[in-house]
Amino acid sequence: MANIKSQQKRNRTNERARLRNKSVKSSLRTAVRSFRDAAHSGDKEKAAELLVSTNRKLDKAASKGVIHKNQAANKKSALARALNKLG
C-alpha cells in the first residue's frame, strides 16, 4: 500500500480506469464475435449491419485510448475483408 497521498489517489484512479477498460474490451470482443458468427453463417445483411456497429465501437475505444489506433484499424480492415469475402 502506498504511503504517499498522491500515489494513493493514483491507485484509485488506475483501478477505475482498469475496470472501465475491461468493460469496453469485453464489449468489443462480443461485437467482433457476433460479427464473425454472422459472417461464418453467410448472413451478409446481418454481417454488414454488425460491421458498422463494430467499427463504431472500435473507433470509440481507440479514441478513448483503450486500444491503440493501429490495432483498431487492423481489426476494421480484417472484418471488412471477411465481409467482402462473402460475395
Curated annotation (Swiss-Prot):
Protein name: Small ribosomal subunit protein bS20
Organism: Mycobacterium marinum (strain ATCC BAA-535 / M)
Protein role: Binds directly to 16S ribosomal RNA.
Organism taxonomic ancestry: Bacteria, Bacillati, Actinomycetota, Actinomycetes, Mycobacteriales
Keywords in alphabetical order: Ribonucleoprotein, Ribosomal protein, RNA-binding, rRNA-binding
Record bears the keyword rRNA-binding: yes
Similarity section: Belongs to the bacterial ribosomal protein bS20 family.
Gene Ontology CC annotation, any one: small ribosomal subunit
InterPro entries according to UniProt: Ribosomal_bS20, Ribosomal_bS20_sf
Gene name for this UniProt entry: rpsT
